[in-house]
Amino acid sequence: MDYAALSPHLGGWALRDHHIGDSSLRGGAINWGNLGSRITSALNSTGRWLYNTGNRFVHSNTFNQIKQGIQDSGVIRNVANLAGETLGALTDIGRLKLQQDLEKLRRKALGEEGPATQAELQALIQALQAQVAAGEPPAAPAAPAPAPPLVPTTRPIPEMVTEVKPPVTSSAPAVPVDVPTTLEMRPPPPKRRRKRARPGQWRARLDSLSGTGVATATRRMCY
């Protein structure tokens, strides 16, 4: 196996051990880390220059003279007055258009003009809804009158009339109905718990293991 293929490369040229630790060990032809830091530094310096230039211009005499000239000329006041007059004119135009539509609808309802189209009615309804939303809420509509009772308008045909007969009752004896019954059974006796065989004393346990038990003897000796 060629272990040199695992070493760092600069393009197609492998870096040997005498290059490790110096500036040649960059991992490629372009140092991306250095490029990013340079771009960040350039952006920071550009923003700092723009901020300083704008700050100096705002605090300069030229800017103060321009601002004072605009205030003395009354341009801002004229623009505000013009905006207010334009808004008032638009409101008057909308009110006049609504009055004209109402007058036209009244004439058409009285028959003085042709019937109103569906588009005109829809536009008028939307205008009234907008006016009601801006002003007072509309009055509640009156309850509709009750409908008259339905009256048949045709006579019945004898051939199509069917006679209603009473239900037929049979004289046969009634069939007994099976009623389910339940048997009373005694509950099952409780289960007895079997006692587990427990060994007795330790001597009996030893007897079961060895078969002969442990022989003990007491002997008194004098010295």
Curated annotation (Swiss-Prot):
Residues 189-198 have a biased composition (Basic residues). Residues 29-53 are annotated as: Amphipathic alpha-helix essential for membrane lytic activity. GO terms for cellular component: host cell; host cell cytoplasm; host cell nucleus; viral capsid; viral procapsid. Residues 136-155, 166-203 are annotated as: Disordered. Residues 1-28 form a propeptide. One of its GO terms (biological process) is lysis of host organelle involved in viral entry into host cell. Residues 138-151 have a biased composition (Pro residues). Residues 166-182 have a biased composition (Low complexity). Induction: Expressed in the late phase of the viral replicative cycle. It comes from the Viruses. The record marks G28, A29, T212, G213 as: Cleavage. The keyword RNA-binding does not apply. Residues 31-52 are annotated as: Involved in endosomal membrane lysis. Keywords: Capsid protein, Cytoplasmic inwards viral transport, Disulfide bond, Host cytoplasm, Host nucleus, Host-virus interaction, Late protein, Microtubular inwards viral transport, Phosphoprotein, Ubl conjugation, Viral capsid assembly, Viral penetration into host cytoplasm, Viral penetration via lysis of host organellar membrane, Viral release from host cell, Virion, Virus entry into host cell. InterPro entries: McpVI (IPR004243). Ubiquitinated by Nedd4 following partial capsid disassembly; which might play a role in intracellular virus movement during entry. Pfam families: MCPVI. Residues 213-223 are annotated as: Binds to importin alpha/beta, involved in hexon nuclear import. A motif (Nuclear export signal) lies at residues 66-75, 204-215. Residues 47-73, 206-212 are annotated as: Interaction with hexon protein. All late proteins expressed from the major late promoter are produced by alternative splicing and alternative polyadenylation of the same gene giving rise to non-overlapping ORFs. A leader sequence is present in the N-terminus of all these mRNAs and is recognized by the viral shutoff protein to provide expression although conventional translation via ribosome scanning from the cap has been shut off in the host cell. Belongs to the adenoviridae protein VI family. N-terminal amphipathic alpha-helix domain is essential for the membrane lytic activity. This is Pre-protein VI. It comes from Fowl adenovirus A serotype 1 (strain CELO / Phelps) (FAdV-1).
